[in-house]
A protein has these predicted regions:
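Residue-level signal for the start and early helices of compact helical domains
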Residues: 3, 8-11, 87, 142, ...
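Immediate post-signal-peptide N-terminus of mature secreted/exported proteins
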Residues: 3-76, 180-184
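Residues that form generic nucleotide/phosphate-binding pockets
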Residues: 44, 80, 92, 166-169, ...
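A generic secondary-structure boundary signal that marks alpha-helix termini
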Residues: 50, 113-117, 172, 179
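Non-cytosolic head/periplasmic domains of membrane-anchored proteins
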Residues: 60-152
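Extracytoplasmic/luminal low-complexity segments enriched in Pro/Gly and acidic/polar residues
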Residues: 157-186
């Protein structure tokens, strides 16, 4: 077998993640087996691109086990699968003044709504419970005022999982820099 063939078989794909989650009966594993299975799933997810992870979230593949996990397992899974970029993004968000935080939150929510509308128009509405805008106006105001780190650190594992699409959109918004650039003076 050549190096290319070995690499091809070793490369994690969304299909391999689907096959893994379907092949393991998570609810019948011992605590040690569950921990090992969660770590393997986390490693597989971390090897995927952002777009591949989002496709698995849309069809709920990556999170089929989530409802069966204990709160501690959920926390460990989320910590293991949170990209380093998220942690950096949360830190950068914390350093922003409240007016810029509000712009980022508003833009991320607008992008998510626009994406849902495009999917609905093309007949590709995602599964229920995926990619929905999860922040009420009250929560948007709270995130803007106290910062994402404080909000996120006090949230339950379930809330953190529900926030993942929003955080991804915020990260994309902040990375693009569109909302953070100062308007040009004439």
């Amino acid at each position: 077998m050549t190096g290319y063939e070995i690499a091809k078989h070793a490369k994690v794909t969304p299909e391999k993640v689907r096959a893994y989650t379907e092949s393991v009966d998570f609810s019948h594993l011992s605590a040690a087996e569950r921990a090992a299975a969660i770590q393997k799933l986390a490693a597989m997810l971390n090897a995927l691109s952002l777009e591949e992870r989002q496709s698995l979230r849309q069809d709920r593949t990556a999170y089929k086990w989530f409802e069966k996990m204990t709160e501690d397992e959920k926390g460990e899974f989320l910590e293991a699968t949170m990209p380093t970029g998220f942690k950096q993004m949360i830190g950068a968000f914390e350093d922003m003044p409240p007016d810029k935080r509000k712009k980022v939150v508003d833009q991320a929510i607008k992008q998510m709504k626009d994406q849902r509308e495009k999917m609905a128009a093309s007949g590709q509405l995602p599964s229920p419970g995926t990619n929905a805008v999860v922040l009420s106006q009250e929560l948007q105001d709270k995130v803007t005022k106290i910062g994402l780190q404080s909000f996120y650190s006090h949230s339950s594992a379930q809330t953190k999982a529900e926030l993942a699409p929003f955080l991804e959109e915020m990260q994309r918004t902040m990375e693009s820099g569109r909302m953070l650039r100062q308007p040009r003076q004439p």
